[in-house]
């Protein structure tokens, strides 16, 4: 009998602590926009040697009308060009907007924006990497396996750029 009451007390004491733990759940994922332009095939661009590949990443997060739900969108622009110094020619261009719908609970308001812009993209990235890899392979190229993205550094760059755009000396 004493064991039951001890367990009951422990359970009651643990419930408020468990309720305060941060919670993230992916409710859904989707491709908003996808484009693969295979210029090498269209225009006969030679693809000899290692191409120059540029990857641009942008992130966006918006609150949905439902409580604690957010859309997080990862936008990638990947351009592959020949390494011809005189006039580099496009080999392929990929543009992808990939999104996730997230349920976020028990995150402090001041931590919510970094959480949405760092942790949520980390969850989406493996799926984005696979889409890019499959698309380049299906386009007739070796699969392009994107390197891991440092979302913390990307977030810091976005904050610094936003602060640089603000007028100096405003009070």
Curated annotation (Swiss-Prot):
Keyword set includes Protein transport: yes
Gene3D superfamilies in the record: SecB-like
Main subcellular localisation: cytoplasm
GO molecular function: unfolded protein binding
One of the record's GO cellular component terms: cytoplasm
GO biological process: protein folding; protein tetramerization; protein transport
Keyword tags: Chaperone, Cytoplasm, Protein transport, Translocation, Transport
Subcellular location: Cytoplasm
Cited function: One of the proteins required for the normal export of preproteins out of the cell cytoplasm. It is a molecular chaperone that binds to a subset of precursor proteins, maintaining them in a translocation-competent state. It also specifically binds to its receptor SecA.
NCBIfam families, A to Z: PRK05751.1-3, secB
Family classification: Belongs to the SecB family.
Self-association and partners: Homotetramer, a dimer of dimers. One homotetramer interacts with 1 SecA dimer.
Protein name: Protein-export protein SecB
Species whose genome carries this gene: Jannaschia sp. (strain CCS1)
Encoding gene (name): secB
């Amino acid at each position: 009998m004493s064991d039951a009451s001890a367990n009951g007390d422990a359970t009651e004491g643990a419930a408020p602590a468990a309720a305060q733990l941060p919670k993230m759940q992916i409710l859904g994922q989707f491709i908003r926009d996808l484009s693969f332009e295979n210029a090498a095939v269209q225009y006969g661009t030679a693809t000899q040697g290692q191409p120059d590949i540029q990857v641009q990443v942008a992130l966006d997060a918006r609150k949905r009308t439902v409580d604690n739900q957010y859309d997080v969108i990862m936008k990638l622009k990947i351009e592959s060009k020949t390494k011809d110094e005189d006039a580099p020619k496009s080999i392929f261009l990929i543009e992808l907007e990939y999104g996730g719908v997230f349920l976020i609970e028990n995150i402090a308001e001041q931590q919510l924006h970094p959480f949405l812009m760092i942790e949520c993209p980390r969850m989406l990235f493996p799926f984005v990497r696979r889409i890019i890899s499959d698309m380049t392979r299906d386009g007739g190229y070796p699969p392009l396996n994107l390197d891991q993205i440092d979302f913390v550094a990307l977030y810091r760059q976005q904050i610094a750029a936003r602060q640089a755009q603000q007028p100096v000396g405003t009070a």
